[in-house]
Amino acid sequence: RVNINAGWEHKTMLMESERDLPVAGRSLLSASDAYVIDGTIVQNIDKVTEASLSLRFDQTDSLSLLGLDTLGSGQPLRRDSRSQNLTGSASVNGMLGDWRWAVTGNYSDADSLIFTERLGGTRERFDSTQQSFGGNANISGSVMDGWAGPIRASITGGYSGLRFDSRSERGIAVTTTDLARDTPSVFGSLTIPLLDPDYNVGNVGRLSVTLNGQAERPSDFSALTSWGATFNWGITGNLSLLASYKNDEAAPSVSQLGAAPMETQNVSYYDFATGQTVEITTLTGGNPFLRAEQRRDLKLGLNWSPPMVEGLRLSIDYNRNKSYDTANGFPLLTPEIEAAFPGRVTRVGGVLVAIDQRPVNFDRSTNSQIRWGFNFGKSFGQQQQPQAQGRSGERRPQGEGAGRPPRAEGGESGAPPQGGEGRRAGGDGARPVGDAAPSAGAGARGPGGPGGGLGGRGPGGFGRMMGGQQQQGGRWQMSLYHTVKLTDKVLIGPGVPELDLLNGSATGSGGSNRHLVELDGGLFYRGLGTRFSAKYDSGSRVTGGSAGDLKFGDLATFNIRFFADFNQMPKVTENMPFLKGSRLRLSIDNLFDAQRKVTDANGIVPLNYYPGYIDPLGRYVELEWRKSF
């Protein structure tokens, strides 16, 4: 099977003046052109062996304006950039007796070139190249028959490498960076059934335990180990419990350790000490003295599908994380943070003029939360059997534990992915993504709008709604989940008061929101469908000392998708053949143009927190037509 895709996306510039903001000649969102082409080849070598190869190239050219050149021409200062990315991966998997094996390899090359105009007519240049490569081999299968069923094992050996080179030219000053990391690793897991009525062992359902461990040795850091255990207890066919614990070590990233220092001038920043928004100089880069992070994660979960209500699944999860020596970007400069890092802050006559924002280690962070809710969905109408995929009509798994093992808990309780699980999500939280998760390598949508690159919002939900099947009937689905943060605390260092992020302290762009409600649903019938999603998170408060507090208001956002898959409308394609192989999608993000309101103690919105700065894009409408040839 061969699949080739190509695309182009053009975005116009959004100026501050279009959002009634005071700075002339400065853009909120850059203008850009993005191009992408990718292809995939899947080949059956024999009855039990399959190979695949995928390649992708994308390029993005962008232009942003940084304000007027008040010391020179008086024209807007420009920043021109070009990024190019080439990625490739290959895999082969098959069977060796009763054991499944898989071998994968990957390579990526990311190049970036940036020209920035400065006051007085000077021009800076920054270019960088990052190469990532690696591979792994996995084998998994049944080791032996235990007293309650077969004992299964999975072993993965892997290697990953990274090379990063950059050069920064500022006048006669030239700064270069040359970073490298090689990381061999080994991962193993063992699943042991403990109870199973089918084997006449116990009469209280099926109970199993999965033990896992990992060791890796980054070339620029000390050896790291991880281990964990997961208990799965299927009490009945409709009721299951999960408990897992993971002890994990993680090294700071290469850039956190060794990125070249870079100063950025004229950055708008809210000073909690004075209650004013000021223009400052920030210093970013790496910190070679960062320590390894140690994480302790506990998860308890329950899933229940009431037999009296078909298609309904209820779930509740409890997550607790305690981490030591967490590597973080420099936090929001509240009075508490300034007292903990006085050497990182420069003031002249009490006025904030500069901050050293290079990464730091927090001594300890602890957080816990409960997430509960339901999934409800049913099929209706006449169903068509799934079309065959590959040789056997089903997607071939890549082997138990294939690939680099994730750092998440060693099991899932069946609920959709949770935001903020394990590591804490900072700040206000991101706007809900679209109807499907972005593809690998696609630009994720961050503050201010879509990420760079094509495909950042996913394909429109066809696969997610239909599970890869083509159906003549229909299906509807809805889920509602509520997350409640119980604790969220950070200890910056010994002798410094602990920060309670749920009660006035902050490390990110705002406080920590205690409540998060997520609604998701959709309807699909004979090629036509819609998806909707909504998210509400409660507000927060940041204690500002003598300047007063900042209040971050509640925020509710709604997204909706309408789509048509003409592959499932034979009568339409017979009359209009050019629609064969095409899909049409209308997307509206942030349907009601909701924006978080931030006010100080006097009810005034600080300049740095104007809605145009927090979310310059607002409502986003997109019409997309895709056609396969």
Question: Which functions belong to the PLM regions below?
Answer:
Residues 3-184, 197-199, 204, 249-289, ...:
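Surface-exposed, low-complexity loop segments enriched in small/polar and acidic residues
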Residues 8-12, 57-63, 96-98, 107-111, ...:
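Transmembrane beta-strands of outer-membrane beta-barrel pores
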Residues 31-35, 82-86, 129-133, 178-186, ...:
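Residues that define the transmembrane beta-barrel architecture of outer-membrane proteins
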Residues 34-36, 136, 291, 315-422, ...:
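Outer membrane beta-barrel strand-and-loop segments of large Gram-negative receptors
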Residues 398, 402-466, 486, 533-542, ...:
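C-terminal beta-signal and adjacent terminal beta-strands/loops
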Residues 39-43, 90-94, 135-141, 186-192, ...:
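Residues on the lipid-exposed face of transmembrane beta-strands in outer-membrane beta-barrel proteins
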Residues 409, 413, 418, 426, ...:
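C-terminal beta-barrel architecture of Gram-negative outer-membrane proteins
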Residues 2, 47-51, 98-101, 151, ...:
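Repeated loop/turn-to-beta-strand initiation elements of outer-membrane beta-barrel proteins
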